Amino acid sequence: MEEGSEAQPPLQPEAVSAEASEPPPPVPMDQDEGQAAAAEAMEGEAEGAAAAAGTIEGEAGYAAADADPMEDEAADEAGAAEPMEDDPPTSSAPSATAAVDDSTIARKRRRRKKQFPGMIPTAGVRVLRAAASAPSAAHLNGVPRRRGRPPTSSSLRLARELDAEALIALAAGFPADSLSEDEVAAAVLPRIGGVDQTNYLVVRNHVLALWRSNPLSPVASNAALASIRAEHAHLVAAAHSFLSDHAYINFGLAPSVISLPPCPPPSLPPPSVLIVGAGFAGLAAARHLMSLGFKVAIVEGRLRPGGRVFTKSMRSTAAEYPDIAAAADLGGSVLTGINGNPLGVIARQLGFPLHKVRDKCPLYLPDGRPVDPDMDARVEAAFNQLLDKVCQLRQVVADSIPHGVDVSLGMALEAFRAAHGVAAEREERMLLDWHLANLEYANAAPLVDLSMAFWDQDDPYEMGGDHCFIPGGNSRFVRALADGIPIFYGQNVRRIQYGCDGAMVYTDKQTFRGDMVLCTVPLGVLKKGNIQFVPELPAQKREAIERLGFGLLNKVVLLFPYDFWDGRIDTFGHLTEDSGQRGEFFLFYSYSSVSGGPLLIALVAGESAIEFEKTSPAENVEKVLETLRKIFSPKGIEVPKPLQAICTRWGTDKFTYGSYSYVAIGSSGDDYDILAESVCDRVFFAGEATNRRYPATMHGALLSGYREAANIVRAARRRAKKVDSPKKMDVNNEVKYEVKVDNIDLDDLFRTPDAAFGGFSVLHDPSTSEPDSISLLRVGIGARKLGSGSLFLYGLIMRKNVANLAAMEGDEQRLSTLYRDFGTKLVGLDGLGDSGSSLISRIKAAARK
């Protein structure tokens, strides 16, 4: 995938290469503390948090590298206006010039999904209030719970505090008046219901609100107890433990959070976890597991972290414009809904400014004329009515047919359109096609492929608040999240094998062994079957992988010498005469105000996104320029040649095979849950396609990583409670593995090594002292302090080379020399081969004497 950068046609823009030229070696040292600049609060958590139960779908998320999409593209912010999921642009025509007329109607960009009546409770948000009668010692009731508050304090103020805290919890994804599924699974209370549950919910909401009020400083359990009565200390401990384990509090990249010492691991030696994929899900899980005392390493196929979140630096090579440059998000690009969004918390911790997406989105006819405002409003209303008709139809089907029936959303919409004579005129039909293309953009799929019954199943969980962009691109998140995490780049995973004694990850270069594996690869990779699971995954999971859809969205990114389209708008749309090409360059985003340069991005959705990859990049760029000329030439505005152009190719990217997930015909939200299920407490799954509430979003991927980190912790604790025994265990009722028992622990032997320097330690062959004899090398990867939270990898090295390694300055130089000069590969113990096994046997035999 090469990127094109020539200013004159023929341009050679191909899907940009997301890889670095040389994979950085794993860093076996102390984890650096990420610098986090404190910023003003940007998240009005409680303010409008009720929208979390409403409809603002936070959308697309992941994004791509190389062109990994997961296009979170949705909304722009101060400049890159990508549409917001939930509501489609609603604007009227622009003025005769490129400038935006004040009369232009605000168009909510990016209709992801429509919120239908009855999909969420209509009685409003239910919050916990103080009991008005018979105060008891057990209740957090009308008696002030804040210590030191005068007894004359108004109970109304307490009720308001409880309401505000419940709204914050709601925005973070918790039920307002019941335990979440995760809380039930974690057994936060001995029994469900009753007084303890009521009080626990108030305490949980309070602890969460304390954290969200100041995420720059961790919330300690005793700090929460300072404002809660002592008799409820057990509830504070339960809530604090749950929220910490699941990264609802004390997560992120604030210096005070990073500097916290790791928690004691559930067992010794600490459990080890191999994570496949360094996207948002993998990075979030790795960082959280390390904070909980686990040994962690990430295996990544690309030569960079981030997965489908990738910011490409674009720069002019033209002599007359030497200083023009911009940062372009080729994949996920928008924070969709800031209330409750963990990325909003991390942005605040790092001091990243957030830019609200502007709503105006003028539309243009194929000949460049602006769309008539009255017709625009009329057709949009008709479009919404069509969606309402589909909603009514599926309700009738659900009520009348026991097991329901699923058909194509596109087919249902077209049937109602034809039956009611909607958009019969030519221009009306073009405008309706634009709205349909916008819907295809939101779902990364042609409407004909979407499930009529469940395509919008995640609407009730949308996060409220503004849709925002991060100036400079979302790779700023990636760099901060990846800092200090051991990542092995350029490792294409071929097989994941698991049994009762652990799991192994086989790449085309090395073999890794751990206690558990977390797989975060995109759904497109799972669909291709490029990774073999041994034993085979359960049939239910394989069927869910088959049923769920994984769609496609592409972009054409253009760096111009100057902004000719008027930076006062973030988005503008273009209508097409051919319904079959309605998704081709239907929406443009201006990133001028957030990218650092005059950057314009054209979106390609639906069937057009598929056809786009069959056409050469140069031809696609010329098509975009022709479209822009039709819009701006009638206004007397010349469209200059781009200084650099990039076309994404998400569908053919071997690390994604698409952009992000959608609910296909025959699928449902249940399939997201099935994908999230672990196998034998050894193999776990994360990523946007495992998040039923927030699929196709960056925050959905991040949250899934935190979720699985908590599940891994629970699994490790369960395992630690069991007494080790040499029993056989069934794995999927198919394959049996024998637990290995060895009365000599290699970890004990490495406590007194023959040589130790930095993160390296060595055991020599006890049967010989020849310089050319082989020694066993162990490297601690990702240790804050050697032996604490580190993952150990092994290699074979000649005894005479040990002194050379020890004399070098720093472990990075040692690793580089190890790979380049000595040809030593670092692997798990089982990857050392016969020579390694024989050497270990001799070392252990000598230790027994």
From Swiss-Prot:
The keyword Cytoplasm does not apply. Keywords: Chromatin regulator, FAD, Flavoprotein, Oxidoreductase. It comes from the Eukaryota. It comes from Oryza sativa subsp. japonica. Residues 106-115 have a biased composition (Basic residues). GO terms for cellular component: cytoplasm; nucleus. This is Lysine-specific histone demethylase 1 homolog 1. Its cofactor is FAD. Residues 159-260 form the SWIRM domain. FAD binds at residues 300, 302, 308, 688. PROSITE patterns: SWIRM. Signal peptide: none annotated. Probable histone demethylase. It is an enzyme of class 1 (oxidoreductase). Residues 1-118 are annotated as: Disordered. The keyword Oxidoreductase applies. InterPro entries: Amino_oxidase, FAD/NAD-bd_sf, Flavin_monoamine_oxidase, Homeodomain-like_sf, SWIRM, WH-like_DNA-bd_sf.
